[in-house]
Swiss-Prot record:
Disulfide bonds: none annotated. This is NAD-dependent protein deacylase. NAD(+) binds at residues 20-39, 98-101, 190-192, 216-218, 234. The keyword Transcription applies. PANTHER family: NAD-DEPENDENT PROTEIN DEACYLASE SIRTUIN-5, MITOCHONDRIAL-RELATED. The active site is at H116. Belongs to the sirtuin family. Class III subfamily. Residues 1-249 form the Deacetylase sirtuin-type domain. It comes from Pyrococcus horikoshii (strain ATCC 700860 / DSM 12428 / JCM 9974 / NBRC 100139 / OT-3). It is an enzyme of class 2 (transferase). Its main location: cytoplasm. Substrate binds at Y64, R67.
Amino acid sequence: MMAEVARVLASSKNVIAFTGAGISAESGIPTFRGKDGLWKKYRPEELATPEAFERNPKLVWDFYKWRIKKILKAKPNPAHYALVELEKMGILKAVITQNVDDLHREAGTKNLIELHGNIFRVRCTSCEFREHLKESGRIDEILSEDLPKCPKCGSLLRPDVVWFGEPLPSKELNEAFKLAKEADVVIVVGTSGLVYPAAYIPYIVKDSGGVVIEINVQKSGITPIADFFLRGKAGEILPKLVQEVRRIL
């Protein structure tokens, strides 16, 4: 099946990738839904909400500081780099991710759409201020503050991520849906396919006559519409797939 999938990719003009927590789990980042997603006995869905932040911003910030420290230790894995290779080969047009860990960008992906935000970005709860902490070099400063404040207006800063119950950013979502309509192939990597509206992306590709390739350690909500299902770790499968594509080209 690997050779057949490689042939599909090699002959495609417009491929997109749609990635979820599974691709980052291989870099050692706990998934929200897994048993290792717990922090101090709290479930993420108890903390990653606007209500929790309003009730106890310090608790929510402590949770995010813990996640930031964990993610800072993580490195992109072979799956991230394989997607970069496909982009360099001119096959992959964009990566649409549900992850907030910045690993795709760190690996070198150029055209990246982050549907759920980025844990290294902060935004003000009052004014328009936004900041990417890796770019500004202020990660340590934010981690050392009890409650990070906006340098412009002094209001509370919050992580620039999408919390449970919040809408996805319309610009990114519209762009992702547009790419999905135009794509002839989507590579779905490590997503449960349960978080909507993001999970519509493979369905849009399918409805537009495209091919759905899924790479996952287990079956997901996307599997029923997948034309190809490659079971296993993305870090093992994607590099092999890239090798096969190279051989064909």
